[in-house]
């Protein structure tokens, strides 16, 4: 599913114009992005948590040469699905065979 698909779904289900649906979806994504940029956690009940983690710098190895290199510190985004989402995914697997 793409952002355009999400906009189309909001348009069909809520009844806003396509322009309004696009603006709402953009605002939601912008809010999520800005919150994550500040390093804050996002909890969406029944869906899951988006968490920004700090990774320390560490020594890695070039697999071709064996040379040690430093991997710089960085922030990574992780997603932990809620139990409700996990259950919904597993229930849908039981109802419909995978394609």
UniProtKB/Swiss-Prot annotation:
<dbReference type="GO" id="GO:0006417">
    <property type="term" value="P:regulation of translation"/>
</dbReference>
<comment type="subunit">
    <text>Heterodimer of an alpha and a beta chain.</text>
</comment>
<dbReference type="InterPro" id="IPR010992">
    <property type="entry name" value="IHF-like_DNA-bd_dom_sf"/>
</dbReference>
<dbReference type="InterPro" id="IPR000119">
    <property type="entry name" value="Hist_DNA-bd"/>
</dbReference>
<dbReference type="GO" id="GO:0006355">
    <property type="term" value="P:regulation of DNA-templated transcription"/>
</dbReference>
<dbReference type="GO" id="GO:0009893">
    <property type="term" value="P:positive regulation of metabolic process"/>
</dbReference>
<keyword id="KW-0810">Translation regulation</keyword>
<dbReference type="GO" id="GO:0005829">
    <property type="term" value="C:cytosol"/>
</dbReference>
<keyword id="KW-0233">DNA recombination</keyword>
<keyword id="KW-0805">Transcription regulation</keyword>
<dbReference type="InterPro" id="IPR005684">
    <property type="entry name" value="IHF_alpha"/>
</dbReference>
<protein>
    <recommendedName>
        <fullName>Integration host factor subunit alpha</fullName>
    </recommendedName>
</protein>
<dbReference type="GO" id="GO:0003677">
    <property type="term" value="F:DNA binding"/>
</dbReference>
<dbReference type="InterPro" id="IPR020816">
    <property type="entry name" value="Histone-like_DNA-bd_CS"/>
</dbReference>
<comment type="similarity">
    <text>Belongs to the bacterial histone-like protein family.</text>
</comment>
<dbReference type="GO" id="GO:0030527">
    <property type="term" value="F:structural constituent of chromatin"/>
</dbReference>
<keyword id="KW-0238">DNA-binding</keyword>
<dbReference type="GO" id="GO:0006310">
    <property type="term" value="P:DNA recombination"/>
</dbReference>
<keyword id="KW-0804">Transcription</keyword>
<dbReference type="Pfam" id="PF00216">
    <property type="entry name" value="Bac_DNA_binding"/>
</dbReference>
<comment type="function">
    <text>This protein is one of the two subunits of integration host factor, a specific DNA-binding protein that functions in genetic recombination as well as in transcriptional and translational control.</text>
</comment>
């Amino acid at each position: 599913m793409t952002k355009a698909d999400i906009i189309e779904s909001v348009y069909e289900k809520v009844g806003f114009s396509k322009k309004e649906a696009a603006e709402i979806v953009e605002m939601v994504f912008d809010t999520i992005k800005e919150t994550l940029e500040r390093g804050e956690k996002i909890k969406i009940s029944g869906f899951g948590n988006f968490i920004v983690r700090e990774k320390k710098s560490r020594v890695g190895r070039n697999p071709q040469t064996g040379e040690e290199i430093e991997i710089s510190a960085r922030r990574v985004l992780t997603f932990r699905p809620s139990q409700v989402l996990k259950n919904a995914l597993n229930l849908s697997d039981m109802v419909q065979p995978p394609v």
